[in-house]
Amino acid sequence: MTGPTGRRGPTGTEVALIGLDLGTTRVKALLVGLDGRELGQAERPTRWQVDDDGTRADPLQLAAAGVDVTVEVSALAARLGTRVAGVGVTGMGEAGVLVDRVNRPLAPVIAWHDPRGDHARIESELGRATFERGTGMPLDAQPSISKILWLQRTHPGADRAIRFHSVPEWVLLALGGEPVSELSLASRTGLLGLADARPWRPASELVGGSLLAELILAGQPAGHAGAGPGLPGLPQHLPADLPAALAGATLTVGGHDHQTASLAVGAARDGALLDSFGTAEALLRCVRAPLDPAAVGRLAGHGVSIGWSVVPGHHTVLFGLLAGLTLERLARLLGVTDRDGRRNLGLAAVRASPTGRRVLREIDGQTYLGPLVEGLTPAEVWAAAVDQLADSAGRAIGLIEAEVGVHRDVVLAGGWMRNPAVLAAKRTRYGGSASADAAVNEAGAVGAAYLSGVAAGLLPRPAVDGLPQWNQSARPREASQT
């Protein structure tokens, strides 16, 4: 660990911040000093139940994992003689929890990438164009409303829900926070109107009422650790039993993970493109609101979403590809199962001669593994797949630029950017406009920690075209190789 352990807050006590990132693969907590230096981290695997029906998670298990890693890093804070001043929670969008009046979960969490959803009903009753222009979300199985309607139809009791909490908002409750709906996460639900950032009436009528809580911006206070009642069903994780170093910390929702990460790496500004390549690859632009409704309709029709940003007064234009997941599956088919193996495969792919072969196929806008081409080496297969995925990303960027203008610079982030073949392909396509910000370890958690400092009144909210204070000076240590 490097750097000082924190900085003195208003009371003269050494203070630090926690960023919690509830990801598709891992639940991660980062302890960060007020200067941006990483002090420690903890993680647990995100436990999904996968079967022939799809991918789901137990809401209470997810909450317990989030509390566990937060408690673990707060124990480190105590050993360092540091008090936790703020906790910011970010994570996956779309997935969430339907609850009753006492926040008891009524259905499992359906994974954001699970194909189950009742989007046919939305199209039948509201119309595709109306939904996409009204919410900024493409009409498919991904928006939360599609999964909510499917659960209401198939899961007994789900139709009694009075609230829907996105996963980060759910874990905030477990820490003793207040019920809130953060704007960037609410924008992923299909329940929020894009024009006015209020519950969208057609969606509310379709699901039986507004399922959103009080709407807030990422970085606004949403209670204090240990102050609220927590969640029924988690007696071993009562907020009142939180460690003294954590009790009373200001809580906030850090927003949708891709957007929170873009803030941490300095890409949440006009004219910048974030290409964040993790399990999903996110191509993200931050643009001043409002966006012309006709442009919203055209973008959504191409699978590009538009929603409210973690930056005040801005929209996020986002296109997602399951690129990292595709490479993970391909690596397993090639007999490569660890990070070193993937790195070596990437190095070999950089040296391989281009074959022009296509080893992936696209169906309905999604990329799938195609039949591996006989006669190619593993390195040639890897190189061909990486090039195909980079081409898909390039086409999506072209669609976005046609509506919001050409980007001036590019920030590359995410674990897969540390694979030599992926980074080489991106640098080839972006040229000199690309900067790799791999120095930020766990950018989503770092961004959430920063926003908790904003909520606690210890750090300034970044200016609209500025960089977070941490991005201008100290950086956390480097992430491990993907």
Model-identified regions with their sequence ranges:
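Short, basic and Ser/Thr-rich N-terminal targeting/leader segments
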Residues: 23-26, 83, 90-93, 144, ...
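Short beta-strand-loop/turn "lid" adjacent to the catalytic site in phosphate-handling enzymes
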Residues: 78-112, 138-142, 168, 172-193, ...
